[in-house]
A protein has these predicted regions:
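A solvent-exposed, acidic/Ser-Thr-rich amphipathic alpha-helical stretch
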Residues: 43-112
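Charge-dense, low-complexity intrinsically disordered segments
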Residues: 8, 12, 16, 59-66, ...
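Hydrophobic pocket/interface hotspot
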Residues: 25, 37, 72, 109, ...
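Short, low-complexity N-terminal intrinsically disordered segments enriched in polar/charged residues
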Residues: 1-31, 39-43, 50
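Short helix-to-loop capping/linker segments positioned immediately adjacent to catalytic or ligand/cofactor-binding
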Residues: 25-27, 80-87, 120-123
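A beta-strand edge to alpha-helix "cap/lid" segment located at domain peripheries
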Residues: 3, 93, 98-165
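A generic "alpha-helical surface" signal
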Residues: 16-20, 28, 63, 70, ...
Length: 165
């Protein structure tokens, strides 16, 4: 699959491919297969988690920012071996996957998400909610994320943001 092929695909095919990549993305996180998570990005990717209030005002301050797949891998290594945090599990719910079009060989996609967090004590709460703004590109391995901007509506994060959203 090449970037030129993305614009040639029917909207239903674009939607299917985008939805599949998003499903793979949240499954890696929810099933704690975090070492596989960076493989869903291209090498020169951008991953940003930013509060809606900052995004709306054009402010650059992010809760998390990585500008390469190597940084994503480093984040997972730190999570597994250096960070100390309460054991928890995520469960994502995605909705309204909307392919906005193809621009410069990139599939522009927006979707909504809610993340439920369950702590080892068994309590489950809504941890975070917002939208994904994605730029996806075709690679020999299939569709991959060139850019993922996670814009969260949640006013505050109730505890440490360790695991990717």
């Amino acid at each position: 699959m090449t970037s030129l092929e993305l614009s040639a695909l029917a909207p239903s095919e674009q939607h299917f491919l985008a939805s599949k990549l998003l499903s793979d993305y949240v499954e890696c996180i929810d099933d704690d297969r975090l070492e596989e998570w960076p493989d869903l990005f291209v090498d020169d990717c951008v991953y940003q988690v930013i509060a809606r209030e900052n995004a709306d005002r054009g402010l650059p301050t992010s809760a998390m920012f990585c500008d390469s797949r190597g940084m994503l891998r480093d984040r997972i290594v730190a999570l597994r071996h250096a960070n100390i945090y309460a054991k928890h599990y995520y469960r994502h719910v995605l909705s309204n996957v909307n392919v906005k079009g193809v621009q410069d060989g990139e599939l522009l996609v927006q979707s909504n998400y809610v993340v439920f967090q369950t702590l080892v004590e068994g309590d489950t709460q809504i941890f975070n909610a917002g939208k994904y703004i994605d730029r996806m590109v075709a690679t020999p391995d299939g569709l991959r994320l060139k850019s993922k901007r996670v814009v969260f509506d949640t006013y505050r994060i109730p505890n440490l943001l360790v695991t990717p959203l």
